[in-house]
């Protein structure tokens, strides 16, 4: 093989790796668009009936009169772990009387979900979807996924992927939940 062909072959093998690396770096620096997808969500609102790590069973009446974010996550999911601090920040900012953020752990033992919450300082209620039933009922296939309900209990948005909930666009989505 001549030198020219070898150089072209090496370059063609190297370019995809460089493109992936550059894309990751640009995303980390905030130079690309969001790593999430927002779609309208109209329900249906399946039964909730999930236990949290304290033993409380959560039902729809527990959520009435406030906006709600149902965040499906798992401790093995890197984007889930990355967005969790910003979920805690918006929950702290608005308070549970106005915005209730429920972190719904997907198919992990309660001890693992509780350990994650303790080591990360997470104070959100952590609900346990140990069988994946709730995720299945609501069509959750990507982690993290957040389902948003307005303060009248109406389903509004489905967000797939990692979100910085303290940034402008997600903040507008949250504010829109109080306008109902």
Regions found by a protein language model. Give the residues of each.
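Short active-site neighborhood of thiol/selenol oxidoreductases, capturing the structured segment around
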Residues: 61-76
């Amino acid at each position: 093989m001549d030198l020219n062909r070898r150089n072209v072959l090496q370059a063609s093998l190297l370019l995809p790796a460089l493109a992936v690396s550059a894309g990751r770096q640009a995303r980390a620096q905030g130079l690309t668009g969001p790593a999430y997808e927002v779609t309208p969500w109209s329900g249906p609102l399946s039964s909730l009936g999930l236990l949290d790590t304290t033993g409380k069973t959560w039902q729809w009446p527990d959520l009435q009169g406030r906006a709600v974010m149902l965040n499906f996550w798992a401790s093995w999911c890197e984007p889930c772990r990355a967005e969790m601090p910003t979920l805690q920040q918006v929950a702290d900012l608005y308070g549970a009387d106005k915005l209730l953020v429920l972190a719904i752990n997907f198919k992990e033992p309660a001890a693992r979900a509780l350990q994650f919450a303790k080591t990360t300082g997470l104070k959100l209620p952590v609900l346990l979807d140990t069988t994946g039933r709730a995720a299945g009922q609501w069509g959750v296939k990507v982690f993290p996924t957040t389902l948003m309900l307005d303060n009248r209990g109406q389903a509004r948005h489905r967000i797939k992927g990692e979100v910085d909930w303290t940034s402008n666009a997600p903040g507008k989505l949250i504010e829109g939940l109080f306008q109902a």
